Each structure stands twice: as structure tokens, then as C-alpha cells.
Amino acid sequence: MKPGKGYKAMLDEANAEITTLEVPEAIEWHKDPDVLFVDLRDPRELEREGQIPGAFHAPRGMLEFWIDPESPYHKPVFAEDKQFVFYCAGGWRSALAAKLAQDMGIERVAHVEGGFGAWKAAGGPVATVEKKSGGK
């Protein structure tokens, strides 16, 4: 395998180009109806930990397809004129996702430093997520 960029270099690049919110600021943004939080975590993480109330769940592996209006998997929510705030468990996936969304043409993007773990530790609101039936 030819050596390429590692995840650390990719995170450094992303963090240099995107807006990063500390948790207290993110909690304030959560009160704004123009802001949509996007949860990138795996469904099992949501079921185990809960999520930010009102967040839209977009698994990280589907994000490119859900954002692109030309994709058969496009989700109209990503065409809305909203401020998108991405988050994951610890802030790495969300930094990369915010950079990706920005590269794909979404202008108002940010991510939560420290992710859901930091949000929860700071006492941010948390909603319970019901386990989906039919799965293991």
C-alpha cells in the first residue's frame, strides 16, 4: 500500500477549515430553530447513550450519498437552508464529516468539539433512543 494521508493529517486539515463549537456554545446553538444537529453515530451508540434532542441521525457511512442531490439516496433535509452541526462520540468523525459537507457545498456547517461524550459530561440535554425492533 502506498502511504497516503493518515487520519491525524486529515483531522488537522479538517479542523483548520471548519467551525468547531465548544460544548457550552453548542448548547446555546441547540436552542436556535435554524440549527440542525446531525448525529453521525452508529444506531447502537444512539440506543446505548441517547442523543441530542431533535438531532437528525445520519450514519457516517451514508453521508456523501445523503448530501448529494444527484444521489438516489439523497435526503432533502440536507438541501434545507439550515446551520448544520455535526457530532459523533468524540469529535473525530464529526470533524471529517463537517469538512466533507463543506466540500460538497453545504456552507453553514460546524461540529462539536469532544462530541456527544463532552456534551453529556457538560450536562447538555439528552433524549432516549428506542431500540429498533426486528434487529439483533
Model region roles, listed by residue range:
Residues 1-35, 43-83, 92-136:
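Rhodanese-like catalytic fold shared by cysteine-dependent sulfurtransferases
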Residues 38:
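Active-site flanking residues adjacent to catalytic metal/cofactor-binding acidic residues
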Residues 87:
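Short, surface-exposed ligand- or partner-binding patches at beta-edge/loop junctions that are enriched
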